[in-house]
Amino acid sequence: MTNQEIREIFREIADLLELKGENPYKIRAYRTVVRSFEEFAVPVSELHAQNRLNEIPGAGEAIKAKIAEMVTTGHLKYYEKLRAEFPEGIRELLAVSGIGPKTAHALYSDMDIKSLAELEEVINSDKPLPRMGEKTRENIRRALAERKKG
């Protein structure tokens, strides 16, 4: 598993934990490791093979164990279990530029939006969006249009 793949998994874990309302320190730990991986040039598989995971800035014991699991098995049970707690649609919302965990949570919990199609319908209507202004609506509208273009 590449550094980029691990980074993306940890980024999604942090987002899902935020949606879930988890401990902010736990979320911050994952985001710190994500930032570390953005600048880390050494392949994590190499570090694992040499028992040097402690060189990853910000990685505590729990995160190092998760990295080891990903490197050795190619997947992470914790991640799979966490993903299963949320419908696919909410994860799709997180993939839209301009929609972070707080916005996705508001759309999902306040407006029961569970898919990109439902989001697009609401964005293009006159329905008020919870805790969002017209600028956010326009940014999301643009991001959805760009996603359609491919």
Residues covered by each model-derived region:
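Double-stranded DNA-binding cores of transcription factors and transposases
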Residues: 3-39
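Accessory alpha-helical DNA-binding modules that contact the DNA backbone or grooves
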Residues: 29-150
